[in-house]
């Protein structure tokens, strides 16, 4: 049963992929670790946010890129020891972002 993402409040972590080689793992590890220490049954919502492009094709490319980034972040979370069943994944497009972003919410 795939958990659903509830987007409310501010994200715990925002990873901006303006550089595809961004080093986000330490920040992510610390944030997840602190959250799990406080609430051992915490679950997380991972939201891939793609910028709206100048046309439909560009928006599609942005969506495809950000989904790959989100999968990379999910693999990082699992490598930290977080069970994949504790992470729900979803995607959206937004006019509020200019580069692909991955937002992580505590559920």
Feature-to-residue mapping (PLM):
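Periplasmic peptidoglycan-binding/tethering modules of Gram-negative envelope proteins
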Residues: 1-44, 95-99, 105-107
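Short, surface-exposed beta-strand segments enriched in small/polar/acidic residues
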Residues: 10-14, 34-66, 89-93
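Short amphipathic alpha-helical surface patches that serve as generic macromolecular interface elements
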Residues: 15-17, 67-74
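Periplasmic OmpA/Pal-like peptidoglycan-binding modules at the C-termini of bacterial envelope proteins
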Residues: 71, 75-107
């Amino acid at each position: 049963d795939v958990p659903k993402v509830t987007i409310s409040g501010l994200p715990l972590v925002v990873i901006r992929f303006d550089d595809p080689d961004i080093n986000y793992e330490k920040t992510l590890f610390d944030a997840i670790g602190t959250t799990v220490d406080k609430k051992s049954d915490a679950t997380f919502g991972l939201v891939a946010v793609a910028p709206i492009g100048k046309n439909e094709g560009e928006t599609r490319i942005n969506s495809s890129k950000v989904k790959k980034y989100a999968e990379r972040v999910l693999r990082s979370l699992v490598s930290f020891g977080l069970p994949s069943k504790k992470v729900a994944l979803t995607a959206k497009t937004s006019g509020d972002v200019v580069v692909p972003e991955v937002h992580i919410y505590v559920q």
